[in-house]
A protein has these predicted regions:
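Scaffold/interface architecture of coatomer-like assemblies
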Residues: 26-354
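Bacterial N-terminal signal peptides
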Residues: 9-23
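Charged interaction patches that mediate protein-protein contacts
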Residues: 1, 13-17, 236, 350
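N-terminal secretory signal peptides that target proteins for export/translocation
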Residues: 1-7
Length: 354
């Protein structure tokens, strides 16, 4: 019972961390990079049965550079970076800090499994995440149990998220089909331009998804979406570690899955034990999205094979050696770089299907 109490307070804070002063706002549509309202998340997107050839496709890799303490390293230049495509160095054609509008989906588990983690108290932690986003950024809220439900379509008005949070009542289903929810969200984001991210707030439990785990990974490899995961059942993981049997293995597997989603896409995964850890986590998500470097390169003709390619981003100092940084006391600190681990290459040519 002690474990459940910890999780209850923790998930309560997570819910309210996305909430602040209520103001009814109608929110429709997914944003295009130019600021216009894009295709709605609520509409089914039918994919065309053909593809078009692209003369000079660009692969954009967002990279975050920090020290081992999580301090962001800014002021780096194009010459500090090297991008490897399947081990082969690429010419970085475009380089910039990422100041384009952010598009982020808050994808939150809302099932009978997680209901005990909710509470209805006023709190101000929403500012820890939403207030760090810029006015031009877009946020959507999607919850899931047996299936995903769009609570707030993409909006620039952050209070719409809080309004939707307050409307949540007792979940209608006990199931939590996480894989289906991730796959559905990725499908909806496919037609959205610009910088796209998912903030996944979940126990990590998947009950009866039709989508398999390997299919989720395949979709992630084909997308350019960064996933940030907050595993809300860490106290349960800790309790499982104290017990013998399959439960400990199951919890470890769920944690590893969330960590893998983040690692593959260049994001982070957190597993907070206490409520007090949450504000820093939400600030980290917002800070990451606003402090990345955008590195672009054009794949060679031979590389345009429609296959998955492994990416590696390296950062070096002016002398070409690994970048070295020190803290205020002059102590050497390790440099940590976050970037997606690969991309699916375009085809060199394409024709319409019959």
């Amino acid at each position: 019972m002690k474990s459940i109490g910890i999780c209850t307070r923790l998930f309560s804070a997570l819910v309210l961390a996305c909430s602040f002063a209520a103001e009814p706002v109608a929110a429709q549509g997914f944003p295009e990079q130019d600021g216009a309202a894009p295709t709605s998340v609520q509409a089914e997107q039918k994919q065309p049965e053909y593809s078009t050839s692209v003369e000079s496709p660009l692969v954009v890799v967002d990279a975050l550079v920090t020290d081992e303490d999580g301090n962001v390293l800014m002021g780096l230049k194009k010459g500090n970076f090297r991008v490897l495509d399947d081990g082969k160095p690429q010419i970085i054609t475009d380089f910039a800090t990422t100041d384009a509008p952010i598009t982020i989906v808050i994808l939150m588990e809302y099932s009978g499994i997680a209901y005990d983690y909710f509470a209805y108290k006023a709190a101000s932690w929403g500012t820890e995440f939403l207030d760090h986003l810029e006015q031009q950024d877009w946020v959507a809220l999607v919850t899931y149990d047996m299936k995903p439900t769009v609570r707030v379509d993409f909006t620039r008005s952050k209070p719409a998220v809080e309004q939707a949070m307050r409307s949540l009542s007792y979940p209608g289903f006990h199931e939590a089909n996480m894989f289906d929810a991730i796959a559905d969200t990725l499908d909806r984001l496919e037609q959205v331009k610009g910088k796209k991210s998912i903030l996944l707030i979940t126990t990590g439990v998947d009950t009866f998804s039709r989508t398999r785990l390997d299919e989720v990974f395949d979709k992630l490899k084909r997308s350019n979406v960064t996933i940030f995961c907050i595993g809300i059942a860490e106290s349960e993981y800790l309790m499982a570690d104290l017990r013998a049997g399959t439960s400990s293995i199951g919890y470890l597997q769920m944690k590893n899955q969330l960590q893998s989603f983040a690692d593959l896409t260049g994001g982070f995964a957190w597993f907070p034990r206490f409520e007090g850890e949450l504000p820093d986590m939400f600030r980290s998500v917002a800070g990451t999205l606003s402090n990345q470097y955008a590195l672009s390169f054009s794949p060679t003709q031979e590389s345009r094979d429609g296959k998955y390619h492994k990416l590696k981003v390296e950062v070096s100092g002016p002398d070409g050696l690994p970048l070295k940084v020190t803290d205020k006391k002059g102590k050497a600190r390790k440099v940590v770089l976050y970037a997606r681990q690969g991309y699916t290459a375009p085809m060199a040519s394409a024709t319409a299907n019959d």
